[in-house]
Curated annotation (Swiss-Prot):
<feature type="binding site" description="via carbamate group">
    <location>
        <position position="219"/>
    </location>
    <ligand>
        <name>Ni(2+) 2</name>
    </ligand>
</feature>
<feature type="binding site">
    <location>
        <position position="221"/>
    </location>
    <ligand>
        <name>substrate</name>
    </ligand>
</feature>
<feature type="modified residue" description="N6-carboxylysine">
    <location>
        <position position="219"/>
    </location>
</feature>
<dbReference type="InterPro" id="IPR017951">
    <property type="entry name" value="Urease_asu_c"/>
</dbReference>
<dbReference type="GO" id="GO:0016151">
    <property type="term" value="F:nickel cation binding"/>
</dbReference>
<keyword id="KW-0479">Metal-binding</keyword>
<feature type="active site" description="Proton donor">
    <location>
        <position position="322"/>
    </location>
</feature>
<comment type="subunit">
    <text>Heterotrimer of UreA (gamma), UreB (beta) and UreC (alpha) subunits. Three heterotrimers associate to form the active enzyme.</text>
</comment>
<dbReference type="GO" id="GO:0009039">
    <property type="term" value="F:urease activity"/>
</dbReference>
<dbReference type="GO" id="GO:0043419">
    <property type="term" value="P:urea catabolic process"/>
</dbReference>
<keyword id="KW-0533">Nickel</keyword>
<protein>
    <recommendedName>
        <fullName>Urease subunit alpha</fullName>
        <ecNumber>3.5.1.5</ecNumber>
    </recommendedName>
</protein>
<feature type="binding site">
    <location>
        <position position="362"/>
    </location>
    <ligand>
        <name>Ni(2+) 1</name>
    </ligand>
</feature>
<comment type="similarity">
    <text>Belongs to the metallo-dependent hydrolases superfamily. Urease alpha subunit family.</text>
</comment>
<dbReference type="InterPro" id="IPR011612">
    <property type="entry name" value="Urease_alpha_N_dom"/>
</dbReference>
<dbReference type="InterPro" id="IPR029754">
    <property type="entry name" value="Urease_Ni-bd"/>
</dbReference>
<dbReference type="InterPro" id="IPR017950">
    <property type="entry name" value="Urease_AS"/>
</dbReference>
Length: 570
């Protein structure tokens, strides 16, 4: 016997369905469910008196014969490819299926089998996303990794050796010895990790040594001398070994101007860090490279979005991070040349146009690694408020804008760094690196972080309490973050040369090495999903005004942001 219930009652019980809309945190961003893979009247739900019981929603099928290890029920999946309601199956640490779960012996349309060996994560009323990828990490301290993980980031790529002055300023791990020691340390951390070697050299030998020693990318940084010769040599080595190059160009224009750097690229693919320029790069016009077909541009989060406080906080940050002395006039001039309200305002709009493709942190080096996700959505909200709906969206929802912005910290850095076959989206066949959110806390405080199919972190109440919820509630590492479960649930990204050689054996590591691939001529700006715009960008050298295809890009700084003090005491 069937019965009819209201949409609100249905949503309370099983989560939103097709046509229902959900607000993301306290922003003005609204998503609308595009499709529901579940079957009305046959939904599965766990709990006392609920559906997933033996002989009902749970079948007799063994895991060996096809039952899932874990099913996330009735979640709203938000990803670059769509916004849908579905059950999501995890098997052997991978995303096995996105569809309708249940017992095929008694239920129709079942493509995910729940058996006695299946665990359940309740996704009703929740949003499910891919784990975030922060591709601009200064590995200054190991405590960073837990902070990033608790924010929903499950993959980190960068360079450094700890709190050395080279690491404070540059995302480079210099030399094979340091690279090897850093990779050995990675066995302690429950996230995917990759090392960028120092790319500043005019001859190839030292760079080849680092790539073969385990680096998955090379980083050119002005503090080590990003000259045209170093750029050309680094890109040549990268082409030979299929690794990505990231660049922080010459702020002082000592060895050339932005045109000279572009010439040194020779049309080759390169990932441009903090493309606006406050984080470093040719002053005042490095932002021009965001319009080039071979440049994969990203932002770092301290300039995201442009607010009334952005300019004031940057000067002190820069002096500390780049070992500058405020009593030296030249050091002060160097710092002031990098901080321009005009280019920071333009950065907001270029993100909204899809001309800036990725978001990252610049952790502890003019960036906050726990705020990559928050600041992405704050930027999206600011642009919705100031620019209205995108042409691709309707008055009902912001689905396209949401897909554009989520791609900036999930699939696009995964493509840029050659790991999109493994991570970066909620798609079958990929590692189950997933984050579950309550809509009211979306992008701010996750409900649950899943790493390769195992819960690795979550908010947890007093361990001595009679139930899991009593205060104090803290984010805590879970069983997936301990022992051999940790090393079995995450990987180290390396070059193909390193993965194919004896590196893992020589270093004695437990984590698997995963080789990056297809990061050179096989990708370009057009590979950046929903973020592939290539406008002609011009910067006035006197006023710093930025134009894209002749249109002035300017916006007011935000006075108030969402996802801020409503959620945090400090």
């Amino acid at each position: 016997m069937s019965t009819r219930i209201s949409r609100s009652v249905y949503a309370d019980m099983f989560g939103p369905t097709t046509g229902d809309r959900v607000r993301l945190a306290d922003t003005d961003l609204i998503i609308e469910v595009e499709k529901d893979y579940t079957t009305y009247g046959e939904e599965v739900k766990f709990g006392g008196g609920k559906v997933i019981r033996d002989g009902m929603g749970q079948s007799q099928v063994t895991n060996k014969d096809g039952a899932a290890d874990t099913v996330i029920t009735n979640a709203v999946v938000v990803d670059h490819w769509g916004i849908v309601k579905a059950d999501v199956a995890i098997k052997a640490g991978m995303i096995h299926a996105i569809g309708k779960a249940g017992n095929p012996d008694i239920q129709p349309n079942v493509d995910i089998i729940i058996g006695p060996g299946t665990d359940i994560i309740a996704g009703e009323g929740k949003i499910l996303t891919a784990g975030g990828f922060d591709s601009h990490i200064h590995f200054i301290c190991p405590q960073q990794i837990e902070h990033a993980l608790m924010s929903g980031v499950t993959t980190m790529l960068g360079g450094g050796t700890g709190p050395s002055h080279g690491t404070f300023a540059t995302t480079c791990t210099p030399g094979p010895w340091h690279i090897g020691r850093m990779i050995q340390s990675f066995d302690a951390f429950p996230v995917n990790l990759g090392i960028s070697g120092k790319g500043n050299a005019a001859l190839p030998g030292a760079l080849i040594e680092m790539v073969e020693g385990g680096a998955c990318a090379l980083k050119l940084h002005e503090d080590w001398g990003t000259t045209p010769a170093a750029i050309d040599n680094c890109l040549t080595v990268a082409d030979d070994h299929d690794v990505q190059v990231m660049i922080h160009s010459d702020t002082l224009n000592e060895s050339g101007f932005v045109e000279d750097t572009i010439k040194a690229f020779k049309g080759r693919t390169i990932h441009a860090f903090h493309t606006e320029g406050a984080g470093g790069g040719h002053a005042p016009d490095i932002i021009k490279v965001a319009g080039l077909a071979n440049v994969l541009p990203s932002s770092t989060n301290p300039t995201r979005p442009f607010t009334r406080n952005t300019i004031d906080e940057h000067l002190d940050m820069l002096m500390v991070c780049h070992h500058l002395d405020p009593s030296i006039a030249e050091d002060l001039a160097f710092a002031e040349s990098r901080i321009r309200k005009e280019t920071i305002a333009a950065e907001d709009i270029l993100h909204d146009l899809g001309a800036l493709s990725m978001m990252s942190s610049d952790s502890q080096a003019m960036g906050r690694l726990g705020e990559v996700i928050i600041r992405t959505w704050q930027t999206a909200d600011k642009m919705k408020k100031q620019r209205g709906s995108l042409p691709q969206d309707s008055s009902r929802n912001d689905n396209f804008r949401v897909k554009r912005y989520i791609a900036k910290y999930t699939i696009n850095p995964s493509i840029a760094h050659g790991v999109s076959k493994l991570i970066g989206s909620v798609e079958t066949g990929k590692m189950a690196d997933l984050v579950l959110w309550s809509p009211a806390f979306f992008g701010v405080k996750p409900d649950c972080i899943i790493k390769a199919g195992m819960i690795v972190a979550a908010p947890m109440g007093d361990p001595n309490a009679s139930i899991p919820t009593p205060q104090p509630v803290h984010y805590q590492p879970m069983f997936g973050a301990y022992g051999r479960a940790l090393t079995a649930s995450s990987v180290v990204f390396t070059s193909q040369a390193a993965a194919a050689g004896p590196l893992a054996r020589d270093l004695g590591i437990a984590k698997a090495l995963y080789p990056v691939s297809n990061v050179r001529g096989g990708i370009s700006k057009k590979s950046m999903i929903h973020n592939d715009a290539t406008p002609t960008i011009e910067v006035d050298p006197e006023t710093y005004e930025v134009r894209a295809d002749g249109e002035l890009l300017t916006c007011a700084p935000a006075e108030v942001l969402p996802m801020a003090q409503r959620y945090f005491m400090y």
